């Protein structure tokens, strides 16, 4: 039951040397892909680290925290807003297939047009970045339109960065719950040198 998982899952600071099955970790990452994400865009990537030298470098980048220095494996959750156009096209293709399979024939064309407008035009515009200027343009444009009808107005570049991070956090939480169900403990880490982690 979910309550059992929630009661079991804790941020563990010191790991035993009990071997961890890498296939189980990969399976839990597949479950994490099922987490909800904004517009199903999944603008994140999971990097499963098992190499000893890379683990040591990550532990150093994590400021020597015990949960990092004793971990046999790590997963780095990376936001990937740069994939927005590619992911929008992929989701639009899935939507089109779903509409053709499940929608009444007389409603298909309108639903396909709505999907093309949303995933083909709106989302690429909303997720695009350009030194803060595109966010300012979006904020101004959407703010003006919202005077006349309800409209999403939290669309600055900072707002969209938050959206991507929230979706990634949902995937990370789903992963931690899946690991708990598999009988493993986890610890989310934030205190780190992100420049070193990126290397």
Language model regions located:
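Acidic, surface-exposed loops and disordered segments
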Residues: 1-199
